[in-house]
Every structure is written in structure tokens, then in C-alpha cells.
Amino acid sequence: QGTIDDIYDTVCVSMPPGTGKAQPLYSKVLTPDGFVEMGSIKVGDKVISGNGNVAKVLGVYPQGEKDIYEITLDDGSKCRCSDEHLWKVQTIEDRKSGKYRIVDLKSMVNNYRRNLQSNYSIDYIPKINFSEKKLEIHPYLLGYLLGDGCFKTKNIGFATADIEIVEKIKKILPDNHEVVKDAKYNYRIKSNNGSGRGHKGILRLSLENLGLFGLSSHNKFIPDMYLYSDHESRIELLRGLLDSDGSVCSNGTAAEFTSISKKLASDVADIVHSLGGYASVNTKKISRREKENEKTYLNVKNYGATR
């Protein structure tokens, strides 16, 4: 926890009692359609409240210039606020009794460690209820293609040794598409809708509209439409991701998703958080054929999101 060198204009957004106080104008506020800057919030706007539901902004109160602190949580996430910002927390004693308390940041800074342990903790984010959106590609299929699929060239394909996954993908393909086996574990998704040179199938057009078609593994990401989709769609998306590039840790308490794309790893962590789970992103460098590549590892711990 450290004070940011600069002093920023801050604002208070009126929400339920015991929350908020002051955050920088550039702070991100989650809305049903994604994040916006705190400074753009107006009375009547809809935001995601602390319980994961949609709430209406009742008031916006500029706080002037204040010292701003940066708080880092154990999963690596960070936020900035004034020392008057109120937090719903549990202390070491509270965690034993199940009680909660509301304290300002100034109080936490003075005793945030006790007996070499972190004194304060906050709950995981509850399941966030974004509005339902019309998705052109089934979220499981998109998740699988983002993990172990290829759409860099005109041939859209994926790899798997699991015939059950192949059968599932066949059932959720867009109309007039089929799965063609190219090699032992390699499959291609073929469009039968139209013919002729330059013809594009629905799946390719959808990937182009999402800004994904033509991307290499290093540049993959989850489009906002899917990041902020309804609960069931996000679960299906996560299932596709984990079925492709996921694995279960040896102790059975966590799942691990592996990607060379830092943006995709960060997006997967956001999906897990939005489902009420815990996720942390760790990086590790590995050497392949004398060329050093950086791979990003995402550890998803005790998320319970696909149940």
C-alpha cells in the first residue's frame, strides 16, 4: 500500500450505505455494458452494485483534490482511492466469527498486518448479472477456438483427441457448417452456405465482426460482448476455454488455463471473477528451439464456475 505521488480530482458516487467515499475520476466503474470512467457517471446511470446486481446512481458528489492510495490484493488486482474510502472487510478475528465491519482505508493502513499476517480481507466478487446478449457464435465454441483453435487463415480449425468435444462442437455450429477431419487430431470447420471464390461463411464473418479473424495465438482476446454476456453464456465460454487449454492441478483444488496471449489470460481471469471465483495470472518464460518465448499461465483457484 503506497501513496500515489500525484493528487487527483476525486468523486463520490452515492450507492448503498457503507460503500464508497472517493475514487479518482479515471477509476473504472462496472456497468451492465462494461467499464466506464468514474468521471463520466451521471445521476440515473446504471452500474453494477456490490451484490452483483444492477443499481441506479442516486447522486454524484465531487470531492475535490485528495491524496490517493493504491491497494494491491493477493490476486494481483489493484485499485486506487482516498483514505476516506469505506470497505466492507473481515479482520483475523472476524474471519473466525463470520462477522463483517465497515472501515475506512486510513484505519486499515495503520494496522493492515498483525503477527506477520494480513489483517484484512474482502469477499470474492459475487456473481455478476449482466444482461442477456445476442451472440452469433455459441460461447462454448468461441471459448474452444480461443484456446485450441486456429482462425488465422481462411481455414478455421481446432485440435482435440476427445471425440466428445468434436460431437459437441458439431451440435453448436452455425447453420450450414460441418466438421471435417483433416488429420488424427486436427479438424476443420467448413461452410456449406454458398460457393465461389471469395465466399465467406457465417462463422468467419462473425469472427471478423468480433475482430478475431486473422489473429495469431499471441493476440487472442475475449470480445466485450462475451465478457459482459449473461451468466450461463459466460459459464459456457469458460467451459470451452478450459476444455481446450485447461488442466486440473495435481492437488485437485484448482484449474489452470494456459495461453501465450497476456490479454486472453487477463480476460479469462475477468470471466472467473465475474462468476464469483478467484483467479490469479502468473507468467513464466520457457525456451523452445533455442528461441525464448514468454507464456502466460492463468491459475483459477476454487472457482466452482462450471458446476
Language-model segments: which ranges?
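Short, basic/aromatic beta-hairpin or loop at an interaction surface
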Residues: 22-31
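Short, solvent-exposed loop/turn positions at domain surfaces
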Residues: 32-36
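Long, compositionally biased intrinsically disordered regions
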Residues: 282, 290-291, 296-301
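Short, solvent-exposed coil/turn segments
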Residues: 6, 24, 64-66
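Intein-associated homing endonuclease modules of the LAGLIDADG/DOD-type, together
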Residues: 28, 38, 43-53, 58-290, ...
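Phosphate/NTP-binding elements of NTP-utilizing enzymes
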Residues: 1-22
